[in-house]
Amino acid sequence: MSVQTKRLIKRVISYSGIFFFILAAGMLWWQLRNYSLSDIAHAILDIPFMNLTMACVACMLGYLALSLYDCLALNYVGGRVSWWKWMLAGMLGFAISNNAGHAVVSGGAIRYRLYTRWRIRGGDIVKMLTISGFTYFLGASAIVVISYFLVPHAVFQNSVGASIGINALFIFCLVTLLVYFATTMFFHKKSIKIGQLKFQIPSTRMAFAQTILGITDSILAGLVLYFCLTPFVKIPFVVFMGLFAIAQSTGVFSQVPGGIGVFETVFLVALPDTVDKANIFGALLAYRIIYYVLPLIGMGSLFFIYERWLRSRMKHWLNEAKEKIPAKISRIKSEIRIRK
């Protein structure tokens, strides 16, 4: 492949996010063209307090599950850090990448800052990010495959493009699962070299752990929206999870940060026309606030406190060093004089 072709592919991928965002924004406007902002605001306020509380609990459990991605990845590279450290790095990394998109760059930067400080090598951090990415895709792929058989296909009959997209997504996810598990079964003891890094192929046991963790994370994230949505529309949880997995996966593949606009459009298109779209969009906005905005504020504040504490601790160490070093130097000098 020539250099020009590689550059062209990179440009297409980088601009695809803008294209899908504009497309999703247009479809979103079309779905909501008959509603006002006050209708959507009333929909958010109409969500019962108990539902919002349960959504917040599901969100907290979801981010705890996300932090286990880092725990699993650390075990893969043989790294050892305290439990609170990988929890902080995992939750903060995902709080940033969920909002900013491009998880390897946005979430990877904060992980690199933290893990290098905790004596994890840069190459191992890259491996951790790769394993975490596979963990997410395994879980999401498993849910998409299961949901394909559980979600009524009549849901997407009104849109030929959506129907084709769902079938393509199902095939992609199924192939991903089959190839990954086949690789872990038959090539477990082998490794793959990419650049200067050597990746040991995970065991089948680890592949199962990755898939289960990815499914758990997706279900908990889905529960956040489900609790916001149920006051307005009655939908079986299994069918809902299918729609959620499809919408979430579509948002990820679109390259739009946080899948914003794309995720909402899939839901609005999939749900029946008899449902009040303003209520659905209000529930989706509440989900965005609970699962994206609040964790970013909370984890960002916690990281700020940690950085301040670390800085004050380093300042304390420097002050102690300034006091102790001159005393030690004078003691060494006096010992030298005595020996002379």
Label every PLM stretch briefly.
Residues 117, 123-160, 164:
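Hydrophobic alpha-helical segments and helix pairs
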Residues 84-88, 103-106, 117-134, 275-286:
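Membrane-interface alpha-helices at helix entry/exit sites of multi-pass transporters
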Residues 92-101, 243-264:
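Transmembrane alpha-helix interface/packing and boundary motifs in multi-pass membrane proteins
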Residues 103-112, 262, 266:
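Transmembrane helix boundary and interhelical loop/hinge segments in multi-pass membrane proteins
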Residues 114-124, 243, 247, 264-280:
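Interfacial segments of multi-pass membrane proteins
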Residues 1-91, 150-252, 277, 282, ...:
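Predominantly cytoplasmic-facing regulatory/coupling regions of multi-pass membrane proteins
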Residues 96-100, 124-144, 250, 285-297:
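Membrane-embedded alpha-helical segments of transport systems
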